[in-house]
Amino acid sequence: MEYKFDREWILEPIGGDTGQAYVGYNDANDERVFLKRNSSPLLTILSMEGFAPKLKWTKRESSGDIMTAQDWVYGNVLSHFEVAQLPVVKLMYRYHHSDNLYNMLVKIDGDVYEPERFLQDYQSNLSKELRNHHFLTCVENCLWDTRHLVDGARKTVCHGDLNRRNFIRAEDNQLYLVDWEMVKIADPILDISQLLVQYVDFKNWDAWFDLYGLRITYDIYQRIEWYSMLNLLNMIKKDYQENRMMAMNHKILKLKHIYNNRYLQQVGEM
């Protein structure tokens, strides 16, 4: 369904969790752009540093909403296999270590997350069925009991929604990461483990760490376990909300593997 944005632009909604994204057509100039309502305030610097497609303009609507326009990128979303490869690792490393991005997020009072806040978010709007699920409750209790072991880690900019569909490779081979609405200041292991539990086999995690340049210590290993279990809990919660039971059960099996073999179990009993 198309509708007029102003005299120049016709908008057509495209898929997305927010329902605020559009393809914008300007027939007079034969131009196409990606339009989004109330996108991340980081968009300007994300565009400048090459993490996101070029920002073309912004416009305030009569409602007070801000509409942003970016270059329309002709390309493809990454496959399950491609997300685990070196270009994505390099991109993640760059934004995790970008002082400009971090300083801007601090300047605009970006959300700062400690382990306790992540657990509070998980509990928010959690269904009765999942609250009463014995195994998931055991995992959650483990995370509460061991949160002090992962607290106080160095924080960076974290994307927070590393789904393969948010990685776009343009026709010129430029790799972009889009949908920064869940960006936060947190332990970068949040992002790393989020990607690992979705797209990298357990047997290949060490090789992935080498690509990223992550030297595994006991401290880092505990954080990887903790955030891997947290991310899987959140994914299970979302699968349940969206009635994806097969996907949910697959993640529960993955979570059981991590939980039953966890180092945190030994630490928590000391």
Regions picked out by a protein language model, each given a short descriptive name:
Residues 11-105:
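ATP-binding pocket architecture of kinase catalytic cores
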Residues 1-17, 25-30, 249, 253-270:
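Short, Lys/Arg-enriched, disordered terminal segments
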Residues 21-24, 144-190:
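Active-site acidic catalytic loop and adjacent metal/ATP-binding pocket
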Residues 52, 92, 119-122, 205, ...:
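A general structural signal for well-ordered alpha-helical segments in protein cores
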Residues 197-199, 211-270:
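Helix-rich C-terminal or lid/interface subdomains of diverse kinases
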